[in-house]
Every structure is written in structure tokens, then in C-alpha cells.
Amino acid sequence: MLEDPMKQNVLQPLDKAEFRNVVGHFASGVTIVTAAHDGVPYGATISAVTSLCDTPPMVLVCLNQKLGTHAAIRKARHFTINILGEDQASLAHTFATPGADKFADVAVHHRQHGPRLAEALAYLTCRVVDDLEGGTHRIFVAEVVEAQAGTGNPLSYYRGRFGHFVPYRNAMWRTTQADNAVSPH
């Protein structure tokens, strides 16, 4: 019988570098989360974003509590998730850089619930319904109040690098969400 090599790590303390290495193996999309408070726009590149449910449409967003965007969302209680396209790595880098003039030379629609990046691949405007602390971050639970998707491919993030998504083509796999839906039978 083979010994599970991962079993030996189950009860061992996990150091920060090893944790970051392991979670870095999870590929994700790249977003810029924007908000405004007192007329000042804020934005940050965030990959810790996920859908929660579709009835009602809800998302989870995790932000470092040291970010100005975090403070703006806590006060405004609204934000927009701008999903980036594969050609927007430089924009993601700008919004990930502390101290950068993030909105310079960026086309922005100033909306009722804060700024939305005009060139985003897709966006979801959200209203915060709950938030909780998670270590250095805050987890925002939000209801989506407006959403729109364009065309194109998303920017991806994997092991500390930006890249693009290449769909796997296999005729045996179902390709539509309707085909993958769970049957009530």
C-alpha cells in the first residue's frame, strides 16, 4: 500500500511562503474592484473574487484591509467588479501598484455607485449585504445590482504571472451551461 506523501503535512504548521506557493497553483481571473467615497475614486487589482449564488445574484470579494479601496467600500457599501480582458495586463499592474495614479489615462464611466472601467471585458456592480474579517483581509458579500459582459477572452493569473485562457476543446465535453445544469430528476 502506498503512503500518501501529502498526509505527512496535515498536522504540520504551514509557513506563509509555502501557503502562497500552494494557493498560487490555483489559476484565477483578474479584476479591478472600484468604488468611490466622497467623490474620490478608488481601485485595486483583485483576484480573490467569486460568484456565490444566482438567486439572488451574489458575489464574494476579498480585499486587504490596508487598501484605500477597502475603506471606500466599507463606507460607500457599493463597488464594481471590472473583469479584465487578456490584453489588459498593464492595467492590472497599474491598479496593483501602490501610490500609482491609477485612474490617469483610463476611460471611466462615473456611475451612481462609483466608477466603472469603460474598457473592461465585463462588469458587475454590487451592493454590500454583509462583510466579515478574515485575517488581513475583509470578505465582502454583495448582491449584484447590474451586470454586463462584452466579448473576448479574460486575463488570467497563475503563480504570480498574468496570462491568457486557452479553452480546451474536446467533443466529448458539454460546452454550454445549460448542458451542465443539474437535473431535478
Curated annotation (Swiss-Prot):
<comment type="function">
    <text>Involved in the degradation of para-nitrophenol (4-NP). Catalyzes both the initial hydroxylation of 4-NP to produce 4-nitrocatechol (4-NCA) and the subsequent oxidative release of the nitro group from 4-NCA to produce 2-hydroxy-1,4-benzoquinone. It can also use 4-nitroresorcinol as substrate with a rate of nitrite release similar to that observed with the two physiological substrates, 4-PN and 4-NCA.</text>
</comment>
<keyword id="KW-0560">Oxidoreductase</keyword>
<protein>
    <recommendedName>
        <fullName>4-nitrophenol 4-monooxygenase/4-nitrocatechol 2-monooxygenase, reductase component</fullName>
        <ecNumber>1.14.13.166</ecNumber>
        <ecNumber>1.14.13.29</ecNumber>
    </recommendedName>
</protein>
<dbReference type="GO" id="GO:0009056">
    <property type="term" value="P:catabolic process"/>
</dbReference>
<comment type="subunit">
    <text>The 4-NP/4-NCA monooxygenase is composed of an oxygenase component NpcA and a reductase component NpcB.</text>
</comment>
<dbReference type="InterPro" id="IPR012349">
    <property type="entry name" value="Split_barrel_FMN-bd"/>
</dbReference>
<keyword id="KW-0503">Monooxygenase</keyword>
<dbReference type="GO" id="GO:0010181">
    <property type="term" value="F:FMN binding"/>
</dbReference>
<comment type="pathway">
    <text>Aromatic compound metabolism.</text>
</comment>
<comment type="similarity">
    <text>Belongs to the non-flavoprotein flavin reductase family.</text>
</comment>
<comment type="pathway">
    <text>Xenobiotic degradation.</text>
</comment>
<keyword id="KW-0520">NAD</keyword>
<dbReference type="InterPro" id="IPR002563">
    <property type="entry name" value="Flavin_Rdtase-like_dom"/>
</dbReference>
<dbReference type="Pfam" id="PF01613">
    <property type="entry name" value="Flavin_Reduct"/>
</dbReference>
<dbReference type="GO" id="GO:0042602">
    <property type="term" value="F:riboflavin reductase (NADPH) activity"/>
</dbReference>
<keyword id="KW-0058">Aromatic hydrocarbons catabolism</keyword>
<dbReference type="GO" id="GO:0018601">
    <property type="term" value="F:4-nitrophenol 2-monooxygenase activity"/>
</dbReference>
<dbReference type="InterPro" id="IPR050268">
    <property type="entry name" value="NADH-dep_flavin_reductase"/>
</dbReference>
<dbReference type="GO" id="GO:0018592">
    <property type="term" value="F:4-nitrocatechol 4-monooxygenase activity"/>
</dbReference>
